[in-house]
C-alpha cells in the first residue's frame, strides 16, 4: 500500500494527548468550553492525561503479523495489509488523511481500525504548538463511516470507540454516540425478566415468603400478617412446617407465630404423622418456648402413643424437643426405654444418633424426674451425649471469645489451674473448668479429679449434688461462655439446648459462672479482660497465689 504523495514519511507518533471536537452537524472550534482545553491543560499532568485516554489494548489476534514477519496462528495472506493499514492510521498527520485511509481501502479495514483512527484523531487535535485544521465535513464523514460499520464491531471495539468519542467531545445525543450506545446495548446478554410477584395473600403469600432462599428478607410482621389473612384451608402441613423451620433456623421466638403452630397441631392432630409432628415441635424446644395452648401436651402424648412404633427416629426427636421444655411424658419414656424398642433401633442406620438422644433422655430422667419408675437405658447402651463443642460453636469459632478468655485465664491463674473443652460425665462439653478447695483456693486440675461423680440412680433428686459435695470437699466451677448465637434473636432467652446443658450441669453439682457476650464485648484488650475475670472469680470467693496473676 503506497502513501499519498506530498505526505511526510513515517515518524513516531507524538505522546498521547486528548482532544475534543464537535459532533456531526456542529461547527468545530477549540473554544474554552470544549473538551480540547481540558485535554490540553492535562499536558502538565501526565497521570491525568493518560487517565483520560486510557483504553484497553487492541487484541493481538486482530493485528495480523508484525513487520518482523511473525505470523499469527491461523493468519491468512491478508494479515500483512491489515497490519500495514493500522500503522498508516497511527502515523496519519491530519484528520483528512485518516478519512482517506479508511475510505480508500474498504476491503482492508477491520473493526479495530476505527478505534485506532479515533485515538489518532485525539492525538492530532491535542498536538502542539498548533493542531491541524479540521473541516466539518471531514468529521461528519468519519462519523458516518463509523456509524455505517459499527454493526460489525465486537463488544471490545464498541467500548473503545464509545469511550474515545465521548473524550473527543462528540455530543452524547449525537448520531455517533447514539449509534455506538445502541450497538453496545444489543451486545449485552439478555437480562432475565424480573420474577413475577403477584399479590399473594394469606397462605399463598406465607408459603412464597418462606420458600424464598433468603428467609430474612421477610420480617416478622410480613409473616404475621400473611398468617392472619390466611384461610384455614390454606394453612397446609407443608406451609406450617416451612414456618416452623424458619423460626427454628433464625432463632425467632415470636409468640404469635409459635402459638399458631401449636393451634394447628392440635386441630390437625388426626391428620399428622409423627414425621411431620417432629418438624412442627422443633422450634418449641429450640427456642425454649412452652405454648399457652392447653391441649398442646395432651395432643403430643396421643400422637406419641399412636405413632411411636412407626417412626422411631421421629419419636425420639419429639421427645428431645419436649425434654428441652421439661415436659417428658412417662408413657412415651416407657416405650423408648423398652428392650424391644432398643433392640429394634440397634439395627437401623440411625442407631448411633438415636442412642445419643436416648442417653440424654436417660440423663434427664435421672436428674429431673425423681418420680419415674419405669425402664431405663442400659449402661452398655449409653454413649456420650455431646463429646465435643456443638456444631454452631465450631462454625463460629472465629467470632467466639473462647481464645481470648483462655489467654486471660492462662495469665491470671496459670495453665495448670484450668481445663478447656473438657467433657464431663455423662457427656457434656464444658468451656472452662476450675477446681477449688472448700476455702476457695484454686487448685491445679492435675492434682484433682475434675469430674464430679455422676449421681447414682438410687439417689433422689436434690440429694445428688449434696452427696457429691459431702464425699468430695473440692468444688468444680464451670465458666460458661454465653455467645450471641446462644440466645434467641432479639431476646435474652437461652436456646433450649444451652439451657438444658446448664440446667443439667447445675443439677450434677457444678457451680456455673456465666460470661455473657455483652460483658465480654465491652472489654477493650487483654488487661481489661483479666481485670474482668478477676472480679468474676473473686465474686465467687475464689483466690489464687501471686504466681498465677
UniProtKB/Swiss-Prot annotation:
Protein's name according to its UniProt entry: Fas-activated serine/threonine kinase
Which InterPro entries does the UniProt entry name for this protein?
FAST_2, FAST_kinase, FAST_Leu-rich, RAP
What does the similarity note say?
Belongs to the FAST protein kinase family.
Q: PROSITE patterns from the entry?
A: RAP
Q: Which residues form the RAP domain?
A: 477-535
Gene name of the encoded protein: FASTK
Summed up, the tissue specificity of this protein is: Expressed in heart, brain, placenta, lung, liver, skeletal muscle, kidney and pancreas.
The known PTMs are summarized as:
Autophosphorylated on serine/threonine residues. Activated by dephosphorylation.
> Could you read off the lineage of the organism from its UniProt record?
Eukaryota, Metazoa, Chordata, Craniata, Vertebrata
Naming one, the record's GO cellular component terms include: mitochondrion
Which organism is this entry from? Homo sapiens (Human)
Give the EC number(s) listed in the UniProt record.
Answer: 2.7.11.1, 2.7.11.8
Q: What does this protein do?
A: Phosphorylates the splicing regulator TIA1, thereby promoting the inclusion of FAS exon 6, which leads to an mRNA encoding a pro-apoptotic form of the receptor.
Q: Which domain of life is it from?
A: Eukaryota
Which keywords appear in this protein's UniProt record, sorted alphabetically? Apoptosis, ATP-binding, Kinase, Mitochondrion, Nucleotide-binding, Phosphoprotein, RNA-binding, Serine/threonine-protein kinase, Transferase
In this chain, the stretch annotated as Disordered covers: 1-30
Q: Name one GO molecular function term.
A: RNA binding
* GO biological process assignments: apoptotic signaling pathway; mitochondrial RNA processing; protein phosphorylation; regulation of mitochondrial mRNA stability; regulation of RNA splicing
- Cite the record's note on assembly: Interacts with TIA1; the interactions leads to TIA1 phosphorylation. Interacts with TIAR.
Instruction: Show the catalytic activity.
Output: L-seryl-[Fas-activated protein] + ATP = O-phospho-L-seryl-[Fas-activated protein] + ADP + H(+); L-threonyl-[Fas-activated protein] + ATP = O-phospho-L-threonyl-[Fas-activated protein] + ADP + H(+); L-seryl-[protein] + ATP = O-phospho-L-seryl-[protein] + ADP + H(+); L-threonyl-[protein] + ATP = O-phospho-L-threonyl-[protein] + ADP + H(+)
What does the entry note on its domains?
A: The RAP domain is essential for RNA-binding.
Amino acid at each position: 500500500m503506497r502513501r499519498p504523495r506530498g505526505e511526510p514519511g513515517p515518524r513516531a507518533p507524538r505522546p498521547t494527548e486528548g482532544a475534543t471536537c464537535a459532533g456531526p452537524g456542529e461547527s468545530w472550534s477549540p473554544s474554552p468550553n470544549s473538551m480540547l482545553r481540558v485535554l490540553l491543560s492535562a499536558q502538565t499532568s501526565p497521570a491525568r492525561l493518560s487517565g483520560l485516554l486510557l483504553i484497553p489494548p487492541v487484541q493481538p489476534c486482530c493485528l495480523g503479523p508484525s513487520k518482523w514477519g511473525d505470523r499469527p496462528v491461523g493468519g491468512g495472506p491478508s494479515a500483512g495489509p491489515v497490519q500495514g493499514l493500522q500503522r498508516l492510521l497511527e502515523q496519519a498527520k491530519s484528520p483528512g488523511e485518516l478519512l482517506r485511509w479508511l475510505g480508500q481501502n474498504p476491503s482492508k479495514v477491520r473493526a479495530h481500525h476505527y478505534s485506532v483512527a479515533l485515538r489518532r484523531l485525539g492525538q492530532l487535535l491535542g498536538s502542539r504548538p498548533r493542531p491541524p485544521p479540521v473541516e466539518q465535513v471531514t468529521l461528519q464523514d468519519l462519523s458516518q463511516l463509523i456509524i455505517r460499520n459499527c454493526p460489525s464491531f465486537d463488544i471490545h471495539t464498541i467500548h473503545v470507540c464509545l469511550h474515545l468519542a465521548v473524550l473527543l467531545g462528540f455530543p452524547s445525543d449525537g448520531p455517533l454516540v447514539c449509534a455506538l450506545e445502541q450497538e453496545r446495548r444489543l451486545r449485552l446478554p439478555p437480562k432475565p425478566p424480573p420474577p413475577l410477584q403477584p399479590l399473594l395473600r394469606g397462605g399463598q403469600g406465607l408459603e412464597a415468603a418462606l420458600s424464598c432462599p433468603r428467609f430474612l428478607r421477610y420480617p416478622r410482621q410480613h409473616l404475621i400478617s400473611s398468617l392472619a389473612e390466611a384461610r384455614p384451608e390454606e394453612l397446609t402441613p407443608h406451609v406450617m412446617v416451612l414456618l416452623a423451620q424458619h423460626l427454628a433456623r433464625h432463632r425467632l421466638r415470636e409468640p404469635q407465630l409459635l402459638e399458631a403452630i401449636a393451634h394447628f397441631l392440635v386441630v390437625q392432630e388426626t391428620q399428622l404423622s409423627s414425621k411431620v409432628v417432629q418438624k412442627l415441635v422443633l422450634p418449641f424446644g429450640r427456642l425454649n418456648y412452652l405454648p399457652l395452648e392447653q391441649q398442646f401436651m395432651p395432643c403430643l402424648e396421643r400422637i406419641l402413643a399412636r405413632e411411636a412404633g412407626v417412626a422411631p427416629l421421629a419419636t425420639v426427636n419429639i421427645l428431645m424437643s419436649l425434654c428441652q421444655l421439661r415436659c417428658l411424658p412417662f408413657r412415651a419414656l416407657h416405650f423408648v426405654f423398652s428392650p424391644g424398642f432398643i433392640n429394634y433401633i440397634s439395627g437401623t442406620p440411625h442407631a448411633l444418633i438415636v442412642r445419643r438422644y436416648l442417653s440424654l433422655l436417660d440423663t434427664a430422667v435421672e436428674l429431673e424426674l425423681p418420680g419415674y419408675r419405669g425402664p431405663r437405658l442400659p449402661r452398655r447402651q449409653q454413649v456420650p451425649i455431646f463429646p465435643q463443642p456443638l456444631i454452631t460453636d465450631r462454625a463460629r469459632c472465629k467470632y467466639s471469645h473462647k481464645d481470648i478468655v483462655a489467654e486471660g485465664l492462662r495469665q491470671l491463674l496459670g495453665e495448670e489451674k484450668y481445663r478447656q473443652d473438657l467433657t464431663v460425665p455423662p457427656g457434656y462439653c464444658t468451656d472452662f473448668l476450675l477446681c477449688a478447695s472448700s476455702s476457695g483456693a484454686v487448685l491445679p486440675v492435675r492434682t484433682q479429679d475434675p469430674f464430679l461423680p455422676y449421681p447414682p440412680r438410687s439417689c433422689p433428686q436434690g440429694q445428688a449434688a449434696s452427696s457429691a459435695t459431702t464425699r468430695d470437699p473440692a468444688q468444680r466451677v464451670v465458666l460458661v461462655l454465653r455467645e450471641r448465637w446462644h440466645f434467641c434473636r432479639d431476646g435474652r432467652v437461652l436456646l433450649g439446648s444451652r439451657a438444658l446443658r446448664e440446667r443439667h450441669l447445675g443439677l450434677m453439682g457444678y457451680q456455673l459462672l456465666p460470661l455473657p457476650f455483652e460483658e465480654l464485648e465491652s472489654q477493650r484488650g487483654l488487661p481489661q479482660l483479666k481485670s474482668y475475670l478477676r472480679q468474676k472469680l473473686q465474686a465467687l470467693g475464689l483466690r489464687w497465689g501471686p504466681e498465677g496473676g
